[in-house]
Regions:
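Extended, highly charged
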Residues: 1-276, 281-615
Length: 615
C-alpha cells in the first residue's frame, strides 16, 4: 500500500496494532522524551498523544521506531527497494525493448518520480497567522537552549536555477515567530542559502511537518547533491508528490502535509542556536546560525504534529537511518564498482563509523575506495572507515573485528588524515566542522599471512580475571576490562570527567588526561603485544554491551589527538606505525555533557506509565 499523506500511514499503524492512543496529558517539556525512550526500549507501539500539555493539537511519536513499521511504510523491506534500484540501473544502459517489457513496474515507478503541481491540497485547508506557541513543540533535554522543532522538513530552492532540496534540520524556537536554522556543513539547504547570500538576497523557504513516509525518508536520505528528494519520494511511494503555491511566499510547498511553516531567512542575520541534545548522545554546543522568520502557518483540518527524540542510541533515528542506507547502499556500486556492500553504524551516530566491503582487484584498491568515499557528498563527513573483503558481513561488528585482527597491519594499512571537514556535531577536535579522519584497511592481502596463521593468539587462553588483576597492578584506576575476539581490549577507568572547559587555549595547556596516561602504559606491555586494538573508556560506558561500547568509543575520540601506537616514528615526512593501536576514548576537558534525564521527570513518567498504556 502506498501512503501519500501522514495520517493515512498513522491510521494504517493503528489498524496493524502498531499505534496506541492515550488521553493522558503528557508534557512536551522533557516528559515526552522520557516516554519516547522508555517506549522504544520496551518495544511499545507508536504513541498518539491526544492531549499534549499546552497545545490543542495531538502529536505522535515513535511512528518509525521498529523495523516492522519501516517495512509497513513502504510495503516491503528497504533492502528490496535497494536491490530493485541497482538491478534496474545496471541493466538500463543501453535500454532494449526486452528490458523495457521486463521492467514495466519499475519504469512506472520512475515515471511517478516526477513531482506534480496542483491547485489545492490538504496542507492549506486552514491558514493562520504566525504563532509557534500553538504547536506542541518539544523541550527535549534539560540543558537544551529551548524548545526545538525536531521533524521539520525544510524545502529550499537554489536562487540561481530553482532546483529544489529537502532536508531535515532542527529548529530552535526563539519566540512565536522566529527560530534558528541549523544548516550543518554539506547540507543542500545550506548550499542554497550560501548562493542567496552571495546574491545579497533574503531566502524564502517552507517547512513541512508531517508528510508521507516516502517523503520523510527521502528527506533524510544521503542523496547526491542536486538530486531532488521529491523525485526519490515519488519513486518510493509509486505516486507523484504533489506541490502547490505557498500562501505568503513565492515557492511551491507540499500539498499533503499536516502543517506548513512559510517564511524567510535574512541573508546576514545570525543568532546563538543551541545547545541541543543530539544523536551522538551528548549536547552539541551553542553557536551562531541563520534565523528563520515565520510569515504564515497553514495546516490540514485536524492535523497531527509529528515528533521525534534523538539522543544516546538506540533511538527512533536508528530505524530511519538503517532503512535509508538499506535502500541506498547498493547505489554506491554504480560509482565504485569495487564496493560490494557498506554499512554506517547507528551506534556510532552513523558518521563516526562506516564499514565497506571491497572486491579488491589490485593492491590498495580498498584504500582508493575509502578515500573516494571520504570525498563523496555526505559520506565525506565520515570519521572512521574500515574496509573488509567482499563476503564479510559489514553489519556484524564481531565479524569486522575478526577481519581487523587477521588482516590489519598498521605499518601498511592505516591512514590518518588531519585538518579536514568533519560533522558539525562532532566535538572531539574542539573546532566546529574541522577535525581528522582515519582509514583501517582490513581486507585480505594474498602476499601476507594473517595474524592467526602467525600464532598471535596468546590472550585467548588467558583468564580475563587474571588479566584484570594484572592490569590493575599496572594502574589502580583501571576498574574493568573486556577482551573481544582477541582483537579489541576495552579498558574502563575511574577518572574525573570535566565538562565545559572554557577555551581551547586552556584545554591545550592541560596535562595529558588519565586515559592517555594509562593507554601509553598499556601499549608498552609485552603481555598485550598480540592484541590489535586497545580502547580506554570512561566509567559511564558499559564495556560488556556492544551497542553501548561502540557508542562509547567511536563518539569520543579525535583521530589526530587520541590515537597512539606502541611504535610510531617519522621517516622523512612519512609517519610509520607499528604494533598495537590504542584509542583514548575517555571524556576529556572541554567535551560536552552526555544526555541524562532528571530523576524528577523519570518519577513523573513512572506515575503515568500504566495510565498511558491502558487499553
Amino acid at each position: 500500500m502506498s501512503f501519500t499523506d501522514f495520517q493515512t500511514y498513522i491510521h494504517a499503524l493503528e489498524s496493524a496494532g502498531e499505534l496506541h492512543r492515550t488521553d493522558v496529558e503528557i508534557d512536551p517539556n522533557l516528559e515526552l522524551t522520557e516516554v519516547s525512550i522508555r517506549a522504544l526500549r520496551e518495544g511499545k507501539p507508536a504513541l498518539l498523544v491526544e492531549r499534549p500539555k499546552g497545545s490543542q493539537y495531538p502529536l505522535v511519536i515513535n511512528h518509525f521506531s521498529s523495523s516492522y513499521r519501516t517495512e509497513l511504510a513502504f510495503g516491503r523491506h528497504p533492502d528490496d527497494i535497494g536491490h530493485e534500484l541497482i538491478h534496474f540501473l545496471e541493466r538500463a544502459m543501453p535500454p532494449t525493448l526486452q528490458f523495457l517489457l521486463n521492467n514495466k513496474p519499475t519504469i512506472k515507478r520512475f515515471l511517478n518520480a516526477r513531482p506534480k503541481t496542483v491547485s489545492t491540497g490538504i496542507s492549506q485547508q486552514i491558514v493562520e497567522s504566525p504563532n509557534l506557541d500553538a504547536l506542541p513543540i518539544q523541550f527535549c533535554w534539560p540543558l537544551d537552549g529551548g524548545r526545538f522543532i525536531t521533524y521539520g522538513q525544510i524545502f529550499t530552492y537554489d536562487p540561481r536555477d530553482g532546483k529544489r532540496n529537502i532536508g531535515t534540520y532542527r529548529m530552535h524556537v526563539f519566540d512565536k515567530e522566529t527560530t534558528g536554522m541549523h544548516w550543518q556543513i554539506q547540507k543542500g539547504g545550506g548550499f542554497h542559502y550560501f548562493q542567496a547570500q552571495k546574491l545579497g538576497q533574503d531566502f524564502e523557504l517552507a517547512v513541512a511537518l508531517g508528510t508521507s513516509p516516502a517523503l520523510t525518508f527521502a528527506t533524510i536520505a544521503a542523496l547526491p547533491e542536486g538530486i531532488d528528494e521529491a523525485m526519490f519520494a515519488g519513486f518510493l511511494q509509486n505516486k507523484r508528490v504533489e506541490f502547490l503555491k505557498g500562501k505568503s511566499i513565492s515557492l511551491s510547498v507540499p500539498a499533503n502535509a499536516e502543517f506548513i511553516l512559510e517564511g524567510v531567512v535574512p541573508a546576514t542575520e545570525r543568532r546563538m542556536e543551541g545547545p541541543f541534545g543530539d544523536h551522538f548522545g551528548h549536547y552539541s554546543a551553542a553557536s551562531e546560525f541563520p534565523v528563520f522568520h515565520l510569515k504564515a502557518i497553514t495546516h490540514r483540518k485536524h492535523p497531527i504534529y509529528p515528533a521525534i527524540v534523538v539522543g544516546k542510541p538506540p533511538m527512533e533515528d536508528k530505524f530511519l537511518g538503517d532503512a535509508t542506507q538499506q535502500m541506498l547502499a547498493p547505489l554506491a556500486k554504480l560509482i565504485h564498482k569495487e564496493i560490494t556492500d557498506l554499512w554506517a553504524y547507528y551506534e556510532a551516530g552513523f558518521h563516526n563509523l562506516l564499514v565497506v566491503a571491497i572486491e579488491q582487484r589490485y593492491q590498495k584498491e580498498a584504500m582508493k575506495a575509502a578515500l573516494g568515499l571520504m570525498g563523496t557528498d555526505q559520506l565525506s563527513l565520515t570519521k572512521c572507515i574500515v574496509t573488509v573483503s567482499s563476503g564479510v558481513n559489514v553489519r556484524d561488528f564481531d565479524a569486522v573485528l575478526k577481519e581487523i585482527r587477521e588482516n590489519y597491519d598498521p605499518h601498511y594499512d592505516f591512514v590518518m588524515i588531519p585538518k579536514v571537514p568533519l560533522d558539525t556535531l562532532d566535538f572531539t577536535s574542539y573546532k566546529m566542522n574541522l577535525g581528522s579522519k582515519m582509514i583501517i584497511d582490513a581486507t585480505k592481502k594474498p602476499q601476507r599471512r594473517s595474524s592467526d596463521e602467525q600464532g598471535n593468539n596468546d590472550l585467548r587462553q588467558r583468564d580475563t580475571g587474571d588479566l584484570r588483576s594484572f592490569l590493575r597492578g599496572i594502574d589502580r584506576r583501571i576498574t574493568d576490562i573486556n577482551i573481544i575476539d582477541n582483537a579489541l581490549l576495552l579498558v574502563k577507568i575511574d577518572a574525573p570527567i570535566q565538562y565545559y572547559t572554557s577555551s581551547p587555549e586552556i584545554i591545550s595547556a592541560l596535562k595529558p588526561n588519565a586515559g592517555k596516561e594509562i593507554l601509553k602504559k598499556l601499549l608498552q606491555l609485552p603481555e598485550l603485544s598480540h592484541l590489535t586494538l586497545i580502547a580506554i573508556v570512561s566509567e559511564d560506558v558499559d564495556i560488556h554491551n556492544q551497542e553501548n561500547y561502540i557508542w562509547g568509543v567511536f563518539t569520543r575520540f579525535d583521530c589526530e589527538r587520541d590515537v597512539l601506537f606502541s611504535e610510531q616514528k617519522l621517516i622523512g615526512i612519512s609517519p610509520v606505525y607499528n604494533g598495537v593501536m590504542g584509542i583514548d576514548a575517555t571524556w576529556k576537558p572541554g567535551y560536552q555533557e552526555p544526555l541524562t534525564m532528571p530523576e524528577s521527570i523519570i518519577k513523573k513518567v513512572d506515575e503515568k506509565w500504566g495510565k498511558i498504556w491502558k487499553k
